[in-house]
Amino acid sequence: MRSAPVAALLLAALLTPLAGCARTGDEPAGPGPAALPAVEVVLTKSGGIAGLSDTVTVRPDGRWTKVDRSGVSRSGQLTAADLDRLRQLAADPRLAAEATATVPPTMCADAFSYRLLVGQTTTSYVDCPPQATPPAATHAVVDLLTRATG
């Protein structure tokens, strides 16, 4: 009869380290941001009265480089939160839909044009508020990168 308590004690000792691996039910289902595919993202902003031409390239690990029209380069690293958000936006199915949408030509003078390359998907828009609303997913990436890279 002594073997039953010993076996129970042994089983408890073996399973205790695994208790930390159990899900609590409070965690969201599905892949987290780290599980999303990491792709290179390139944003080009051009136009405006001064003839701006800036290109931001973000590597899959969040390192970025920004080059202006004169060739001056700056670099940095996205925060973990910004990188997670960028990965979520890069996986957004709206980007593919926005890439195939037909956009009428704009009549705005001196407006900024944005061209976004996310992996193999290219989207673009002209920031001309009275004529058109920017595509939502593309605009979200543009806003994120503009804020994060200065």
Predicted features along the sequence, with ranges:
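Mature extracytoplasmic domains of secretory-pathway proteins
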Residues: 73-102
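Extracytoplasmic low-complexity, Pro/Thr/Ser/Ala/Gly-rich segments
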Residues: 28-83
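Short C-terminal domain-edge/linker segments immediately following a structured domain
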Residues: 71-75, 87-89, 118, 146-149
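A mature extracytoplasmic/lumenal domain signature
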Residues: 60-62, 68-70, 90, 120, ...
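Bacterial Sec-type N-terminal signal peptides, specifically the leucine/valine-rich hydrophobic h-region
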Residues: 15-18
